[in-house]
Regions:
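Acidic, His/Gly-enriched loop-helix segments that form or flank divalent-metal centers
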Residues: 76-125
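Core catalytic region of metal-dependent phosphoesterases/phosphodiesterases
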Residues: 2-96
Length: 125
């Protein structure tokens, strides 16, 4: 079984489309979250992931876009980007993000955005 994995798109539609153009056919596409944030195309990115991903988990930017979670922990630029994203995200896309979980388990692996215990913990070298 072969999967393609995408993460931290942050609303960058051009980068997402370029990544998809490079991906060989696989058994599924897995998205590790942060579909929105920073970039100018949050709705288009959500819609493309919705259409193509086999499984998707929430990232911290996705959560912030739908319920203000943790905005105080974002740097000022990220906070401003998330507030803008909140104003342009369609209700349908917000509802879809809200339907996602923080983890996705299959027998072979566990998908999370950050770390298995605390989903939004940054992984540092």
């Amino acid at each position: 079984v072969r999967y393609a994995i995408v993460s931290d798109v942050h609303g960058n539609l051009e980068a997402l489309q370029a990544a998809f153009a490079l991906v060989e056919p696989t058994d599924g596409l897995l998205c590790l979250g942060d579909i929105v944030g920073y970039g100018p195309n949050p709705n288009e990115c959500v819609e493309l992931i919705r259409a193509r991903a086999t499984a998707t988990v929430l990232g911290n930017h996705d959560v912030a876009a739908i319920d203000n979670f943790g905005l105080a922990y974002f740097n000022p630029t990220a906070r401003e980007a998330m507030r803008w994203t909140q104003t342009v995200l369609t209700p349908q896309n917000a509802d879809w993000l809200n339907s996602l979980g923080y983890e996705f388990r299959v027998p072979e692996f566990l998908l999370v955005h950050g770390a298995p215990v605390t989903y939004f913990e940054y992984i540092l070298d």
